Amino acid sequence: MKFAIIVPARKGSKTVKDKNLYKLKNKSLVEYTFNQIKNLNFKKFILSNDERILRKASKYKINILYKRPKETSGSKSSTVKTLLHFVKWLKIYDKDISELVVLQPTSPLRERKDIINAINIYKKKKFYSLFSISESLEHPYEAINIKNLKNNSWNYVLKKSKKFYRRQDFDINSYFINGAIYIININKLKQFKSIVTNNHGLYVMRKFNSFDINDFEDFKIAKKLI
């Protein structure tokens, strides 16, 4: 197995303008990921259509930069589509790389040890794919679907199997995909057209390290956590 670290960081965002470059304390958001990977002994690729992000990557001695083409840089372009386009180029650049470790820039509290531990589990268990998860902040039994707020029309998203009097007695252990780490075998990515395969692993992260930034409110919270 030969791993490569991939950081997809496109230009712009619908929720926060230039989110990956938005300042969080003394660094831009994407720099937290650059800092996490700078001493890892893997080839590193920054996938971006923003020259400013590519320049920042160079400052962290991440010199393998891949400028995303227009067709994989829009807000509707999925991570899978971006990766599939990238591996075509990668086949020419370094055909020995077999596994991709994808790190979203929106996880500034992810730690270097999380990345290493996830890779080690992936290798030990011989998975084809893996993603990181953490315990849900709220249980799905307590989630509701609002059909019409004005008419106070709603229902529970997940029906309980029986009546529970205490939250700790719920019969489902609820976790969510936190988006911090994805690992995928390149051949399986091309086969399944997905980052989830028929031999998939999970890596459990602490809630604190799983914090994901999507909007301005998240930035405000993150500033207090960092």
Regions found by a protein language model. Name each.
Residues 2-7, 30, 44-46:
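Hydrophobic targeting segments
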Residues 191, 202-226:
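Hydrophobic helical membrane-anchoring modules
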Residues 22-23, 46, 102, 211:
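Conserved SAM-binding loop
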Residues 1-17:
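N-terminal nucleotide-binding beta1-loop-alpha1 segment
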Residues 40-45, 128, 208-209:
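Short active-site oxyanion
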Residues 52-101, 109-110, 116-117:
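Short phosphate-binding loop-to-helix
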Residues 29-44, 55-56, 60:
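A short, N-terminal amphipathic alpha-helix
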Residues 81, 99, 108-199, 204-205:
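Conserved core of the sugar-phosphate nucleotidyltransferase
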